[in-house]
Design a protein with these regions (language model features):
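Catalytic-core regions of core metabolic enzymes
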Residues: 1-252
């Protein structure tokens, strides 16, 4: 790759070119990961074994091959279900946008953690790998145009990669959720509103079924607070969950 690189690993072909030792028990999967920080790569690969990779690379200073080159290659692999990128900068914007377009065409999610969003961190990136970071708002606008996903922490990146690696298309209806707390119900309504995620309008039939399993004082609004007194909670939650799941207006 180049200086500041921790190497390249193709788990499908069992090819590992690296001066560092990575875990030997990694399981092959559909996550392609392109990281401009060796330590971040180490943190992700040494952490959650539910993250299963077909390929990962620490691209370092990118003297020859850059992150956009790796992105295009990863998107052309049949096994790639999601791409994760940790970026200080984009050295080839035209090629990067070509990759974003291809990902959108192939319906392959891209999860991007972009650092260097502030003046102070931009200077650190320049001293680290010689990367000129550029304007974050411009970068963000490009990402949003092509439906890639910006995250803001390594934890959020790991969680997003895990979710998208099991990605299935769901119908555009609405979600339903069930809780043991009125406060939790209020919290999820706020979060869903922030993300523009709609709640399903439960059918009359579902509401009648819920009325028959919930305690008399409980309402049947979605999201559902099903706790009541907590009596026979396991059975109550199971039945309420199944009724929500069977509603024709609920997609998730």
């Amino acid at each position: 790759c180049s200086p500041n690189s921790m190497g390249i690993h193709n788990l499908e072909k069992n090819i590992r070119i690296s001066p560092f030792v990575f875990p030997s028990d990694l399981i092959t999967g559909g996550i392609a990961m392109i990281i401009q920080s060796g330590s971040v790569l180490g943190a992700l690969t040494n952490n959650d074994r539910r993250l299963r990779y077909n390929f990962f690379v620490s691209s370092g200073s990118e003297n020859v091959t850059n992150a956009s080159d790796y992105l295009l290659w990863a998107l052309k692999q049949p096994s790639t279900s999601v791409v994760g990128m940790f970026l200080e900068s984009v050295r080839d914007p035209v090629l990067f946008i070509e990759g974003l377009k291809l990902a959108k065409e192939k319906d392959i999610p891209i999860v991007i953690l972009k650092v260097g969003r502030t003046e102070a961190s931009s200077k650190l990136a320049l001293s680290h790998t010689g990367a000129l970071v550029g304007d974050f708002e411009v970068f963000k606008a490009v990402i949003e145009k092509y439906n890639a996903h910006l995250v803001y922490s390594i934890d959020e990146m790991a969680a997003s990669l895990q979710v998208f690696s099991h990605y299935q298309t769901i119908e555009r209806k609405g979600i339903a959720s069930i809780h043991d707390s009125g406060g939790e119900r209020e919290l999820i309504v706020d979060i869903a509103d922030d993300l523009s995620v709609p709640f399903a309008r439960l059918s009359k039939e579902t509401r009648e079924k819920l009325t028959n399993v919930l305690e008399p004082t409980m309402d049947t609004n979605n999201p559902l607070d099903a706790w009541g007194s907590g009596h026979d909670a396991d059975k109550l939650f199971k039945n309420a969950f199944l009724h929500l799941l069977s509603d024709k207006n609920v997609s998730l």
